[in-house]
């Protein structure tokens, strides 16, 4: 049985969450994005709803399996393209917040399932959740390739870090994160 101590991670995680909460509100994540690599890199990290959904994707991948990440990539590319081309989704802000809850619910439901997780269903939920967020990015972002590169790298960093941490963490930690995501998404949806 493998033991994993969370103690060395508490300070960096607390500092990161504290900085995120101080610097980001859901409404700020969907303002007009400025051009440039730095703006693109920071956008998915400083927008609380974007940060939480990316942590959720990493959590789902860590709990279910890394195959989920391919679904997330497809959702990100499709959503960004639709948004960049002027596509509109009524209620996208509400759906983006509820997508955070969906990530938590997917983990919790998978843990309770006696048949094990169904990759196709879980992957579709992840792809749709990320597509909504990427659509909003596509609507608001400049056409700058450096902005998109920064956003892709920032998103990859958050998903990769949360995947690495939660894949190694004890199941109860992953379930606690999933429960927090479930509540946070609903809270942001109705804030």
Give names to the regions the model predicted.
Residues 2-191:
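Membrane metalloprotein/metal-transporter helix-bundle signature
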């Amino acid at each position: 049985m493998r033991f994993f101590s969370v103690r060395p991670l508490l300070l960096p995680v607390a500092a990161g969450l504290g900085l995120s909460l101080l610097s980001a509100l859901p409404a700020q994540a969907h303002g007009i994005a400025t051009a440039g690599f730095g703006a693109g890199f920071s956008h998915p990290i400083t927008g609380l709803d974007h940060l939480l959904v990316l942590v959720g994707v990493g959590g789902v991948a860590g709990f279910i399996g890394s195959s989920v990440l391919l679904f997330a990539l497809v959702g990100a590319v499709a959503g960004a393209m639709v948004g960049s081309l002027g596509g509109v989704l009524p209620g996208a802000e509400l759906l983006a917040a509820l997508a955070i809850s969906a990530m938590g619910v997917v983990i919790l439901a998978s843990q309770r399932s006696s048949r094990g997780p169904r990759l196709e269903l879980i992957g579709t939920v992840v792809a749709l959740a990320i597509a909504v967020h990427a659509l909003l990015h596509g609507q608001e972002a400049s056409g700058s390739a450096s902005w998109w590169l920064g956003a892709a790298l920032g998103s990859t960093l958050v998903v990769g870090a949360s995947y690495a941490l939660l894949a190694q963490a004890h199941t109860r930690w992953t379930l606690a994160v999933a429960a927090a995501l479930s509540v946070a998404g609903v809270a942001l949806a109705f804030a």
